[in-house]
Amino acid sequence: MIESPPLLDFKIIDETDDYAVVDKPPFLLIHPTKPDGRRTLWQELRGLFAFEIAAGGQVSIVNRLDRETSGLVLVAKKADVARRFGQLMQRRQLKKEYLAIVWGWPEWKSTLVDAALDRQGKHQHSAIWLKQMIHPSGAPA
């Protein structure tokens, strides 16, 4: 079976032989969640990097973003690079920043959230599927 060419619903911001930095738009899934035929960033990157994959490379998403979230995604193109980025993530040596849209007018210009985060829909009604909230049972930010 011949795979269809990638749709390129995203932009490559930076690329080397080892990794790519992708600007993911909102509502583009990172990985397949169910077999409904919906295109994902991972599938599109596999099509885009088919030559590298044929030569022994891979597509490893280092940091994921929720479906509603837009932003930069780091993609390793080799197993050893994916392992190294994974170690850096575990040790929190890769910095992640989020710009949040808030309701109202906060009294602060910027703030740091260092609290447990969980899916709001697990604890109260949320119109957004993966809307995050501070909750004691959540994972560290």
Kindly label every feature range from the protein language model.
Residues M1-A141:
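RNA pseudouridine synthases
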